[in-house]
């Protein structure tokens, strides 16, 4: 299977980082939510690739970005560290990888659409 690359995507790393900066402790968003908020609903994978290159994960809290199914997703310091960071912010888990009350702690960014 050949995948076409959409060369029209104009998502800049800085735009992704700026959006993540508004996610408060104790809340999460998804790769898809970030892509939607930036006007590119099919760019969730691109968002993940941008976050892999996050030069300052302490300042830009990319640990607050999870998969759309409520699972952790990747993190440059490993899933266990991502889970521990989220737990210190009040996020709870069903097991090692699934967020409890995912819909309650998720921010979808529609509050900025007005």
PLM feature spans:
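Nucleic acid-binding interface residues in structured DNA/RNA-binding domains
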Residues: 2-114
């Amino acid at each position: 299977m050949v995948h076409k690359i959409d060369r029209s995507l104009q998502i800049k790393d800085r735009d992704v980082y700026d959006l993540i900066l508004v996610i408060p402790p104790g809340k999460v968003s998804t790769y898809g939510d970030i892509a939607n908020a930036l006007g590119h609903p099919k760019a969730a994978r691109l968002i993940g690739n941008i976050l892999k290159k996050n030069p300052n994960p302490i300042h830009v809290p990319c640990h607050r970005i999870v998969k759309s199914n409520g699972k952790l997703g990747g993190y440059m310091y490993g899933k266990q560290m991502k889970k521990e960071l989220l737990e210190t912010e009040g996020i709870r888990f069903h097991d090692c990888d699934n967020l409890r009350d995912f819909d309650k702690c998720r921010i979808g960014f529609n509050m900025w659409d007005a």
